[in-house]
Amino acid sequence: MAPSNLPAIFNPSQQDIEMLLAAQCHLGAKNLQVHMEPYLWKTRPDGVNVINVGKTWEKIVLAARIIVAIDNPADICVISARPYGQRAVLKFAAHTGAVAIAGRFTPGNFTNYITRSFKEPRLIIVTDPRTDAQAIKEASYVNIPVIALCDGDSPTEYVDVAIPTNNKGRHAIGLVWWMLAREVLRLRGTLASREAEWDVMTDLYFYRDPEAEENKDSAGVEEAKVPGADEVGPAAVADGFTSEWEVSGASAGAFTSQAAAATTSWDAEPSTDWAATTGGEAATGEGWGAETTGAQPATQW
């Protein structure tokens, strides 16, 4: 790392440099813009340009001092059309009081006062000058300073402060926004001292895939589901399946009839013949043929 021109109090700690390297903030693109050449450390044999992380830290501190110079935090607009930076700008806005535009930038936000989303910020911060070109172009029309996270191949036209870093990796983008928010809070006095650790983890600024998180949650629910829980209900699951089955609505007569039925065999022969029973009914005149027999005429034809 090159010697820093900052005062001693602004020098990065060893942990800050290690975090920048771990998040691969130093890995730039293979293409190089001429205006980004001063931030280049060297070029690897595979063609990847390595960014000087010391310059990255200097520009983070410079950008934080510019942000703190604005009295009203709501006059600062942070923008990210790149999905990897949308979560980071929302968290940055929540911690510093800025206004976030995550997603598509509506043309005319800074120039067309008729639109409902018209804004007049005093400073804008963008994640990528290439994907956020519309915001930078409109800012140039109304004289709004621009701070941008710039890679080796990023256009720097109308960019006032370029923070050299890898603006294509999810970890690199999240870490730079996290460091920028922490430095702003330090300069504002929200953090007691520069030695005090910020209780917000860097993971909060990292991009998370919604589909992956949803699949992870559904997989966890399936693993935690107890077999047979749908049949017995949640109460039995909570009791650990220790409750006994309840028997209700059975009378004593039901058990008596069952006992009586058990004494006889189902394949036993009946005691009387059905034909004999029919004959008996006919003889007594109680059967269905009794009326026919009694209604016969006295004489036959």
Swiss-Prot record:
One of its GO terms (molecular function) is structural constituent of ribosome. GO terms for biological process: cytoplasmic translation; ribosomal small subunit assembly. Pfam families: 40S_SA_C, Ribosomal_S2. Residues 274-295 have a biased composition (Low complexity). Residues 261-301 are annotated as: Disordered. It is found in: Cytoplasm. One of its GO terms (cellular component) is cytosolic small ribosomal subunit. Belongs to the universal ribosomal protein uS2 family. Required for the assembly and/or stability of the 40S ribosomal subunit. Required for the processing of the 20S rRNA-precursor to mature 18S rRNA in a late step of the maturation of 40S ribosomal subunits. Component of the small ribosomal subunit. Mature ribosomes consist of a small (40S) and a large (60S) subunit. The 40S subunit contains about 33 different proteins and 1 molecule of RNA (18S). The 60S subunit contains about 49 different proteins and 3 molecules of RNA (25S, 5.8S and 5S). Interacts with RPS21. This is Small ribosomal subunit protein uS2. It comes from Phaeosphaeria nodorum (strain SN15 / ATCC MYA-4574 / FGSC 10173). The lineage of its organism: Eukaryota, Fungi, Dikarya, Ascomycota, Pezizomycotina.
